[in-house]
């Protein structure tokens, strides 16, 4: 089976001339001679990117998804190929309704007619991983609720594992033979794709992502996220509240319904930056099919988010890196942008900051001939990632996912309102986040988080030091030196914390006394 699949891949490569694309960059002279022989009599009119896209489409949904993931790696691929791969559509015919019903019944342990009323046999959506049916809950606490039932395609895992094994083999050979193999890191790209696919195969994980996003936006009149009905959720079946809206791409329909389109564009950007800089947790598959607008009078004009299989997460370090980069960029402080890249640890330490600064200036300076509203933050990130190739910068997967999502958000926003000033909308979020992190409030919040742990550690330090010294004396192990250094470092950190707490307490006390004295003088008390 695997051999037959390999043969199909081989003949597809020959058919679309991908061997010419790949082998032309191989260093081995014998391979280049073989290329000259195999290309005799073959002529390809279509550009390389188009041929690659057509080849992936002919190999089936797993390779289509691989191409979609590759399209986000603009730090690795030429722009023309990345743009062409972005056109790949994850659309496949639905599987039989009888199979879907059997899968639901096996997963939930009861007949569909017992669980649901009006289970629609024809799916409303179908993709390579799953398809969706509408239904109504029959009994229990959610009786009468209209729901969407997402069902994982049957026998997906063996197919995926087989294709992934072949992709891993191809990646090994590409890295060994291709001139760009080491820089493009094909094995790492395949490993990233492996994780991405297996995450999508777990619908419980998707339900948890949706539940988290719903909780994050509770109380805000910005985004509607369906409720997950956990009693009906398993790794292969997901049941959630049914939300019906108009796809965001149908602008004329929305305008005719009375939706405020410029306001919708601004709120879309606001939703994105709230996810990124407030929550560090963002919907990373924001194409028009997954983003709709409610026309329900109770939630008129509000966004609806669907499909939570791909979610990005950012650490405080990532958010700080992004915020400072964007702020430095708009101040045209390229030295700061270069320094941030070096401080991140993702640039080789031998890199000269002046050389990196010069390259970043060459990328960014042309943008300032335009109005701020015409500057694409996603394009800025993309150009910076492209520059990173020259300096062997290690781009983090979560930032690549963010850049792809940012391009989607900008595209959606400007399709709604061509005059949308993304920077004007984003800047308050960046500045607010920086103030919260660097100011007194940020210091106090971190203090509250760390203080309990340090208060537990402090009383144990004398015993730990005594134990480490005794063990060192007995065993004379060099490894204990590291332990002692770590303990002493922890003690220094704890001392700094206690000093900070003391100073903070004194400052608060003095402030209270001065405030009381001022009030007494002011009011004669």
Curated annotation (Swiss-Prot):
Superkingdom of the organism of origin: Bacteria
EC number from the UniProt entry: 2.7.-.-
Active site: 285 (proton acceptor)
Domain Protein kinase stretches: 118-500
Residues binding ATP, per UniProt: 124-132, 150
Kinase in keyword set: yes
Subcellular location per the Swiss-Prot or TrEMBL entry: Cell inner membrane
Name listed for the protein in its UniProt record: Probable protein kinase UbiB
Organism, as annotated: Paraburkholderia phytofirmans (strain DSM 17436 / LMG 22146 / PsJN)
